[in-house]
Amino acid sequence: MSDHKIKNKESLLSHGDAGAKAQVLELTERVLQRLDARKRLHEMMHREGSELVIGRRRHDLSRYRHVYAFSSGKAGNHMARAFEDLLGEYLTLGVTIIKLRDEEDVYRKTEVYVGGHPLPNEEGIRGCQRMIDIAEQMGPDKMVLSLTWAAAVPN
């Protein structure tokens, strides 16, 4: 499993000014690594026992019978994996709507829907409906965490 964001580096360097391209690709790789949604979420939140710490706020996950995690957008897969990492056994179910399925992504408790962009498709609509169905059943013993990558929000 490669942790590199640029998957076709060799192909890009195989023609033209390889030295200049290598510098640009190295810088681009570093920027993409820094912007990785999974890594960023781990920087912004962590768990201490049963408490999920987000910034200065603490949420005792043991108070909830069910904890759900929703994510959507191009980084939906990375956000879903971060939710699974962070919530662990407290996660009841995750639902994510992504643009592309990545073979490196392995989920334990997350339903994955591949949505259309810029126009919605049937699978994306099913993912939205799944989130709505869960949200309609919410009560004081349930928690939902939801993150949307910018491109998933209509302008």
Task: List where the protein language model places each region.
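Non-transmembrane, aqueous-exposed alpha-helical and coiled segments at domain scale
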Residues: S2-N155
